[in-house]
Amino acid sequence: MFDYLENEEVVLDELKQMLRDRDPNDTRNQFKNNALHAYLFNEHCNNVEVVKLLLDSGTNPLHKNWRQFTPIEEYTNSRHVKVNKDIAMALLEATGYSNINDFNIFSYMKSKNVDVDLIKVLVEHGFDLSVKCENHRSVIENYVMTDDPVPEIIDLFIENGCSVLYEDDEYGYVYDDYQPRNCGTVLHLYIIAHLYSESDTRAYVRPEVVKCLINHGIKPSSIDKNYCTALQYYIKSSHIDIDIVKLLMKGIDNTAYSYIDDLTCCTRGIMADYLNSDYRYNKDVDLDLVKLFLENGKPYGIMCSIVPLWRNDKETISLILKTMNSDVLQHILIEYMTFGDIDIPLVECMLEYGAVVNKEAIHRYFRNINIDSYTMKYLLKKEGGDAVNHLDDGEIPIGHLCESNYGCYNFYTYTYKKGLCDMSYVCPILSTINICLPYLKDINMIDKRGETLLHKAVRYNKQSLVSLLLESGSDVNIRSNNGYTCITIAINESRNIELLKMLLCHKPTLDCVIDSLSEVSNIVDNAYAIKQCIKYTMIIDDCTSSKIPESISQRYNDYIDLCNQELNEMKKIMVGGNTMFSLIFTEHGAKIIHRYANNPELRAYYESKQNKIYVEAYDIISDAIVKHNKIHKTIIKSVDDNTYISNLPYTIKYKIFEQQ
């Protein structure tokens, strides 16, 4: 009988005959099945009268077989049987619905004949809707992933306890493979499961289902662990309905938002994904859909979405730019100025469709960490260059270049010393600044803090830039609103002796240096810098010691005395009608000192090496001797020349050749 029930087309009369001789509750078989188990496992099980006959014959509907399944549990777990509503009802009613939670609702939902009335019966008689399936998904989560979920059943599940709004305390899962928040909302699951129609029975995303889920409080703006909204998945669909797109846009205030994918390092987002053929199912872009995204997108997101695709799909991006109004396009151009490497053909395309390179665009480009001289030259030419003369929110535009290391480029001290002509190959930032300087009407323009470009360059330790600015006419003596000079900044903030020496070489006024010393924050730790300033001021005025701040003069009194001693000694030594001091420390002396290279007094002083502080005097004399010897050799060689110079007196020849 059991073999008959399990494998044959069961006929009621034949079964009645068998039941006269056999016990339907005889479970002495391999699988411990009773007669109900056997029939419900039959792939031809579709006759409710057979089930009723077995029940009327006393078959136990609550008996558990070897898998610990009751008949209804075996029936709803069978993969090759379509659940018949009448059979299920007969099994439930036979136990007074005590076996209701043996009903495998997950298997049932996967079948093609889900009956709303049967679901209602289950719900009305207390079916536990909080049950989870093997992959730990809930009833509603599994149902929306079936081939063609029905809004009425979704309503039924949700209204009777299936939660679709995850609370923070609901994530007590210990499973690594699934957590609700990771997979986003139920709306995410529905969209992802219906992106592509794999068979005739599997429906595309339907607007009525989307509306149903949204009406139950699911926010389309919610994101999953990949930062994706449901709409971001939907635009990958093989069949996109613009009305569904509008539904999924609810609550998303920027459909052009973008982010960098941690795994691929690509720009992602709703609009970015749709424009990227790697994420889009259909080959062609729907411009109506793009316009919808543009209308609800913000300029920065739009820019981030289209720029990465420019190189690979210029035609599409050009078409998109052409559809924008000029105001939006202008905003996009301005945002693009700080994006990274600027592609001039893309800028040209934006300009063609109504954008302009204006002051704001230039100012934004100064904030670009990948700034380059070629692009700057192009932009300034388009704008006219006046933008560099206007403050950017109280800041000097060029000053932004001083603030950080742009890209992988640094400012090298030797760059400027080797000449600006090669600068573009060594340091793009210096080259860029050099391009801007001719447009700058006042190199000493001040920002909202009263600081100049030189102040910024010193503060950020840009030695080559400091050198460039000084050679271009920057004033060392300007004080900021808080009274700080570049010298003060070099001592207190940069702590860069080379910068300090560079500033002192450009001859700041005595008052500037004295004021700078007054602002030194730590007269102990900055001893070397302070001594450099004292050393410089003593050359300018031997009465400086009375003007130096008292705290410094007291601490460095011995150093001041030694400076005075060395300088006074130099002033006593006469060399051909000039003092040693004037030859070494005055502009006139610098022009004639080589003429006295063989003077005994100069030689004696040079060979004594007695200075402890003003040791540079010996380098100056050494250079003068080298220059004198070079001139002398040139004169000796000219004796053999048959020219008018060879017949001139030695002193005349000397004056001629020293000009060379």
From Swiss-Prot:
One of its GO terms (biological process) is symbiont-mediated suppression of host NF-kappaB cascade. Keywords: ANK repeat, Host-virus interaction, Inhibition of host NF-kappa-B by virus, Modulation of host cell cycle by virus, Modulation of host E3 ubiquitin ligases by virus, Modulation of host ubiquitin pathway by virus, Repeat, Ubl conjugation pathway. Coiled coil: none annotated. The keyword Transmembrane helix does not apply. It comes from the Viruses. SMART domains: ANK. ANK repeats lie at residues 31-64, 101-131, 135-166, 190-222, 226-257, 268-302, 325-359, 449-478, 482-512. InterPro entries: Ankyrin_rpt (IPR002110), Ankyrin_rpt-contain_sf (IPR036770), Multifunctional_ANK_Repeat (IPR051165). The keyword Zinc does not apply. Gene3D superfamilies: Ankyrin repeat-containing domain. SUPFAM superfamilies: Ankyrin repeat. PROSITE patterns: ANK_REP_REGION (PS50297), ANK_REPEAT (PS50088). Residues 578-658 are annotated as: PRANC/F-box-like. PANTHER family: ANKYRIN REPEAT-CONTAINING (PTHR24123), PROTEIN HOS4 (PTHR24123:SF33). Belongs to the orthopoxvirus OPG023 family. Interacts (via N-terminus) with host RELA. Interacts (via PRANC/F-box-like domain) with the SKP1 component of the host SCF ubiquitin ligase complex. Substrate-specific adapter of SKP1-containing E3 ubiquitin-protein ligases which mediate the ubiquitination and subsequent proteasomal degradation of host target proteins. Prevents activation and subsequent nuclear localization of NF-kappa-B in infected cells, by targeting NF-kappa-B RELA subunit to the SCF E3 ligase complex. This is Ankyrin repeat domain-containing protein OPG023. It comes from Monkeypox virus.
